[in-house]
Amino acid sequence: MTGPTGRRGPTGTEVALIGLDLGTTRVKALLVGLDGRELGQAERPTRWQVDDDGTRADPLQLAAAGVDVTVEVSALAARLGTRVAGVGVTGMGEAGVLVDRVNRPLAPVIAWHDPRGDHARIESELGRATFERGTGMPLDAQPSISKILWLQRTHPGADRAIRFHSVPEWVLLALGGEPVSELSLASRTGLLGLADARPWRPASELVGGSLLAELILAGQPAGHAGAGPGLPGLPQHLPADLPAALAGATLTVGGHDHQTASLAVGAARDGALLDSFGTAEALLRCVRAPLDPAAVGRLAGHGVSIGWSVVPGHHTVLFGLLAGLTLERLARLLGVTDRDGRRNLGLAAVRASPTGRRVLREIDGQTYLGPLVEGLTPAEVWAAAVDQLADSAGRAIGLIEAEVGVHRDVVLAGGWMRNPAVLAAKRTRYGGSASADAAVNEAGAVGAAYLSGVAAGLLPRPAVDGLPQWNQSARPREASQT
C-alpha cells in the first residue's frame, strides 16, 4: 500500500471513504483515503444461480455479500486508526429487487443479461417507438420493466410489490440507508421519463403503480450507516451491529457502474468517449441534456440507450456489448482458464498474422461464438475474435457520433484493456486520441468512494467539464491483469 492513510476531516479525525461496486462477477469494496490513495480492498464472488431457465440471484445473499465486504474494509480502517466518513454504492443496472412495504423481497434478482422479459407486452400496449422515446431505453429484455412484468406474470406474489430497488440501492438499505432511486440507475429501469426525470406514467400504469422511490442524483446523501432498520431476513447483518469505524458514515448511491467508472477515469465530460471493456464492454458518451427526441428514437432503435447521468444536467449515451463475456467463453473453449493464460494468449495474438477469418457471429445484434475455423492456431482464433469485437464497437460508435457529434478523445478502461491483443486492437482503431487509464484500480469503486466524499461534504463535486480531484493528482495502485 502506498501513500498516507487519509486526511484530517473537519473534526480533526483521520477519515477515509469506501466505494462498493456490485458487479456481475464480483462484489468489491475499496477503502480509499481522501487523497485518492487505495488503502485496502475486499471482495466476494457474485453468486448467481444458473440453470436452463436463466440466471438469477438471491436478494438477501447479494445484500449480505455487500455488507460483508464493507465491514471487512471498515475493520481495516479501524486498525489504521481511521474513521469511515462515507460509503458510496455503485453496481450493475437493470437487475433489482421487488419488495413489499417492509422491504421484504418478493422475487429473485434476474440478471441484467438474462433474456427473460415481457417486452412483447410493452410493445403491444405502449408501442415500441413510444417506449423508446419516452424512456431512452431500447425495447428488449434488458430494461427492468421487462423483467418486472415477466416476474409479475410468472412468480407468485411479485405483483404485490410496491417498490423496485436496483441492486446498489438494495445494498444501501442493508447498510441502514434510506429508500432512494438514483437517476442513472432509474434510467436503466424503463420506469423513468427521459424528458423530465420523473416516473413515466405509461410505465407506472403498466406495472400497477410507480415503483420508484425518492429520486436523487449520485452523490446526494441517502442516510447514514447503521441509522436505518436494514433488511428483514438478515438478522446477522443488522445495521446497529456495524463496526464503530463505519457507524454514522454518510451513505450515497454512486450510480450505474459504467457511469461511476467514467467519472473516476475522467471521461464523464463533453467530447470524451469512454470505452470500458469488462464482462460487458460499454461505449459511453456524456452529453448535455436535452437530446432531441427524434435522435433518442433513432439511437434506441439501434440498441443505444440514453439516460440521466451521474453528472448534473447531462445525459449518458451508452451502447453495451457482451464482449468480455464472449472472450471469457472463447478462452475456455481454447483451454485457457486463468489470467496469465489469457495474457499469454493475447501476446501471441499480437504476433499472429491476420487471417481475415470470422470466428464469431452476430444474431439480432448480439455476438455469439461461431464454429471455430479449422486450421487456425489458438492465437489466430483469439486475434480474429478480438478484431471482430473491435469492429462491432466501431460500428456502434459511428451510430452514436451521427447523433451527438464526433468525440475529441478516448479513455480506455476496464480489465480486458490489459489484455495485449485487446489493447493493440483498440489503439489501432483509435490512434493517438486514446489514453489507457488502467492505473485506476476498480474504477467503479473509486468513483463511488469519491461520490461518498461529495455526499459527506469532504470533496467537491467535479465541474461539468472538469476531472475529479483524484484524477488530477494521486491515483490508486494498478489493477491485476485480466
Predicted segments — roles?
Residues 23-26, 83, 90-93, 144, ...:
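Short, basic and Ser/Thr-rich N-terminal targeting/leader segments
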